[in-house]
Amino acid sequence: MVIEQAELADVLVLTPQPFRDERGVFTRTFDADELDAHLGVPGVAAGFVQDFQSRSVQGVVRGLHGRSRRSEAKLVRCARGCVYDVLVDIRPDSPTFGAHEAFLLDDNDFRHLYIPPGFLHGFQAVSDVADVCFRTDRPHDPREGLAVAYDDPQLGIAWPAPVTVVSADDRAAGSWSDLLAALAVTAPRPVAGQES
């Protein structure tokens, strides 16, 4: 598995090395020892406690979601189809605070992301159907959820396809400015993100 640092501080891009032959493809999608060795902290990967999977049709946007109290780390991959996956750094002490980065994740190269605590996450399905798998290090608790509007002009995320469906909760999400106020921080306008 190849593990690389993303542009956003502390985010890792994990690319498995699949074995392909006439039968198809076989790959290892998770290795706790490799992830811990790269992070330099034993036991991080063993702390993942729940797996989730979503299915979305083309154009659906989910997010931007985070945790308000106890932040969570995530492993995210696309198990079917292709998604445009976006992260926003909401850690006030981070050198990339307020920045976002986008990644194309698909079921061909099996690339996935390690997202440390302190990020908003969202994605858009760009294939006809897309299944996204999440592994988290904290049990889900809807009382801890926070959200920022996927189309917040201060973040300026350029979703690659027309947005077809957004949940009522995501449509009602607050702004980047609302989040800054809730976090009791002041910051310059977020820097524009980029695609990896």
Identify the role of each PLM range.
Residues 1-108, 129, 136-196:
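Non-catalytic, conserved peripheral segments adjacent to functional cores
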Residues 105-128:
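Conserved metal-binding segment of the jelly-roll/cupin
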